[in-house]
Amino acid sequence: MIRNFHQNVRMDNWEVETDLFPKEALEIYSAWNLGQDISSEDKKKYFSAYRGGSQGDYRDGMDAKISNIVACLTLFPHSKRAVITIPNNSSPAHSSDDDAKCLREIHFYLDGQQLNATAFFRAQAADIFPKNIHFVGALISEIASNLDGEVKPGVLHYHATILVADRQ
């Protein structure tokens, strides 16, 4: 177990394939968390409690959140308010996975033509990292593609309060 793990990650390639998360599973989970429609067959094939379950469900209101970030950075390129907060219960029960989202906030900022971000995770199991980094990369890419000019994904400052090997 590592407490307060942090790392800067270049986001020009955010695909980390593993046996648990082959490329298609990564794409399905990211699409789902971006609020896109996915088939029931894909849900059956790829979704499981071990792969993140409800702790990894970040999609609530995601379309509006993405639009808000794009509007914020378009009107105010140096804004400190380009933040996506993942919904959490204000009075969480420690026994509820729904109340314990792993990803808590992502702060976005422009540095020239690069869209950078800082992500705060409550917890990260190393074997689930490929799914989370793929989603964050897809989210940064989606926002960058909707900004004026040739904005590209830049650097992610990744912070996890606790890093463990697996979900056991």
Model features per residue range: what roles?
Residues 1-168:
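Terminal, non-catalytic protein-protein interaction segments that mediate quaternary/complex assembly
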